């Protein structure tokens, strides 16, 4: 594959993932994926995000007969007490999610997959996050902003949700939805040049 390739397909509509790719100088074309994101019975959070990231990438590949550029896909989930927290379906559910993490550590798992003519590579980023102790009023005020509605775990660390986080151990960009270290590594493996970096 041509080492001078600088464009990829991004299998995501996430503005946060787009922002992070712009940050590292990778141009992309969005081709949204459409797969079933249901959790399997007794499926671990790590296995869940790896399966979805791989499935999203391969689903997009199937719609690209030429596959002239690599496809990057990702999936993020939050896990507390072994329970997977996806995107809240209502403000009530968002409040419950935030209450379950209040004053406690939880994990954010983000898997990425890069598919090319040579196959599909995957990587996993896991970050521990400590949320501050939150009162009902603080939770209600945050949820009323609307920010939690499209976020796994009902918060966005890059926005107002960042004021609720005391500490993280791991990848900040991974919590945002695209771990840049792992992403750059897999893209370089596919011949995508990342400005200012090398193997």
Curated annotation (Swiss-Prot):
Gene3D superfamilies: 3.90.950.10. It holds the Pfam family Maf. One of its GO terms (cellular component) is cytoplasm. CDD domains: Maf. Its cofactor is a divalent metal cation. It catalyses: dTTP + H2O = dTMP + diphosphate + H(+); UTP + H2O = UMP + diphosphate + H(+). Keywords: Cytoplasm, Hydrolase, Nucleotide metabolism. Its EC number is 3.6.1.9. The record marks 16, 76, 158 as: Important for substrate specificity. It comes from the Bacteria. GO terms for biological process: nucleotide metabolic process. It is found in: Cytoplasm. Nucleoside triphosphate pyrophosphatase that hydrolyzes dTTP and UTP. May have a dual role in cell division arrest and in preventing the incorporation of modified nucleotides into cellular nucleic acids. HAMAP family: Maf. This is dTTP/UTP pyrophosphatase. It comes from Methylobacillus flagellatus (strain ATCC 51484 / DSM 6875 / VKM B-1610 / KT).
């Amino acid at each position: 594959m041509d080492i001078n390739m600088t464009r990829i397909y991004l299998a995501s509509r996430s503005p946060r993932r787009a922002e992070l790719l712009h940050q590292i100088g990778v141009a992309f074309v969005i081709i949204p994926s459409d797969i079933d994101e249901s959790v399997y019975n007794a499926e671990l959070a790590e296995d869940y995000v790896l399966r979805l990231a791989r499935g999203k990438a391969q689903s997009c590949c199937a719609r690209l007969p030429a596959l002239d550029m690599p496809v990057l896909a990702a999936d993020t989930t939050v896990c507390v007490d072994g329970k997977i927290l996806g995107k809240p379906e209502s403000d009530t559910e968002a409040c419950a999610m935030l209450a379950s993490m209040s004053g406690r550590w939880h994990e954010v798992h983000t898997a990425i997959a890069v598919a090319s003519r040579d196959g599909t590579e995957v990587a996993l980023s896991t970050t521990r996050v400590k949320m501050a102790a939150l009162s009902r009023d603080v939770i209600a005020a945050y949820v009323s902003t609307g920010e939690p509605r499209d976020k796994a775990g009902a918060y966005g660390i890059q926005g107002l949700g960042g004021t609720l986080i005391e500490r993280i151990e791991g990848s900040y960009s991974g919590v945002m939805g695209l771990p840049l270290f792992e992403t750059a590594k897999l893209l370089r493996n596919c011949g995508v040049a990342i400005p200012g970096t090398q193997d």
